[in-house]
Amino acid sequence: MPSPTFRLYNTLTHETEPVEPIEEEHLRFYSCGPTVYMYAHIGNFRSFLTADLIRRTAEAIGWDVTNVSNITDVGHLTQDDLVDPGGEDKMQRALEREGERFANIYDLARHYTEAFLEDWGALNLREPEVRPRATEHVTDQLEAVIELVEKEHAYTTDQGVYFSVESVEDYGHLSGNTEAQQLQATERDVVEDPDKRDPRDFALWKHDPQHLMHWHSPWGWGYPGWHIECSVMGMQYLGDRFDLHTGGEDLIFPHHECEIAQNQSLAGHQVVNYWVHTRFLQVEGEKMSKSKGNFYTVRDLIAPGPDDDHVPDSVREQGGVDPLALRYALMQGQYRKPFNFTLDTLHTAARHVRRYQDAAERVDAALAADADGPDELGGRLRPIYDRTLEAMCDDLNTPAATAAALDGVKAIEQTDRLNGATARSARNWLDRTNALLGVVEPEHEADQRTDAGSENGLAPAHLSDSIDTLLEDREAARADGEYARADAIRDTLEALGIEVMDTPDGTEWERREQVG
């Protein structure tokens, strides 16, 4: 049968729409990734799972996919949820909280990035084509900020550089927030810059020479704002027109609203066509909270430690649940509806995943035996897969998709004798279902594309340009006798895994190790 039409809910238009890629049958999208200051919780991963399912569904209908998913390792302020120009960087606050565990802020970022990637793999999420890190694109971000100032979409104060919300039309369109609602949000700001022109204006660059992660800029030492990071990384790899952008509903305002303002000011036109957001997750009917004891990271549930007393006994006593069971449980609510995560849901998911695994073991044993006989399952399993794919194309209706797919497991279970032909049909169905839903068996991809275009430990081209720019700044500082600034630039490069060598013929560098 022909592939069904892939439809998703577009936050920008408030409509469920057919997804029509700019390039025919090639979906190009950006996914907001984690801020690596703590272990990611199951609500975070529900959003990342949505992006993974978009990818799998697009591939199932024959499309090519290019996905960019970032790592935020600088610039996400504690008050960025409120468009606060002040507040404290989440990375810096994390180091204050856990300073004894880490030598410096880069070690902290490396630790939580590695943990995030481990959790990502455990939940069977496919790797994006590019996973850029904000700290590797600071030069690019500076260039964007300079351009916004030149175009009079931004202005400077003693505290930094701000985007002028008044300079763009339709700010608030994505979220539906009126100007009054935007102003109400800013009333909760912790730190305010008296030189801001409009309370709604947000930071593009923060002037702070004392910040633990800082770079030289035309406005002095400081660091980039969170919103400009994603705008720059998205357009760096996907161009100034791409199909889709994903994230959690908490990012609609202000983060994605700010991204749209920046993107359109830089490009001069709409950059992203579809905005897809995952709704919040509750645990046992309540907001997830450490104070309530219902705050779960992924590793709390798949590999709890002996001191993780907040983890339910039914999970801790068995050493954690199968990661695929957690993935399956998170799929029991459609992404754009609030989801109540319960232990009952988790344990039911574990039983269903075990049935898939038992069926796969039985099928593989039958394949090895390869007994003669007619195919008794192909005709039953093909329409089951079609129904599963139709549900996924219907705005990622994962509850309907997993229910349909379970009928395929039942069909295998109810087949008394699996001959070779029947087993081949069953294995084909299992493989196709796993490619679509990712709940049958772990996938082990050979090309783990965890860094932005890196291959064999070599720095990607865009990073090489940034490094050369930093080295030029360092040489200028040394020539001017500003040795402290030159040393700070060298420290920044070394923390990024770049070894700087001063030779009689000039300064050279090489990539020593990957960050994170």
UniProtKB/Swiss-Prot annotation:
Q: Which cofactor does it need?
A: Zn(2+)
User: What GO terms in the biological process aspect are recorded for it?
Assistant: cysteinyl-tRNA aminoacylation
- Recorded superkingdom: Bacteria
Catalytic reactions of this protein: tRNA(Cys) + L-cysteine + ATP = L-cysteinyl-tRNA(Cys) + AMP + diphosphate
Instruction: Supply the CDD domains for this chain.
Output: CysRS_core
Name the SUPFAM superfamilies on file.
Answer: Anticodon-binding domain of a subclass of class I aminoacyl-tRNA synthetases, Nucleotidylyl transferase
Q: Does the keyword Protein biosynthesis apply?
A: yes
Write down the top EC class of this protein. Answer: ligase
GO cellular-component term (any): cytosol
A GO term for molecular function: zinc ion binding
Span of the annotated motif 'HIGH' region: 34-44
Sequence motif: 'KMSKS' region, positions: 287-291
Instruction: Extract the HAMAP family matched here.
Output: Cys_tRNA_synth
Similarity field: Belongs to the class-I aminoacyl-tRNA synthetase family.
- Protein name stated in the entry: Cysteine--tRNA ligase
Q: Which gene encodes it?
A: cysS
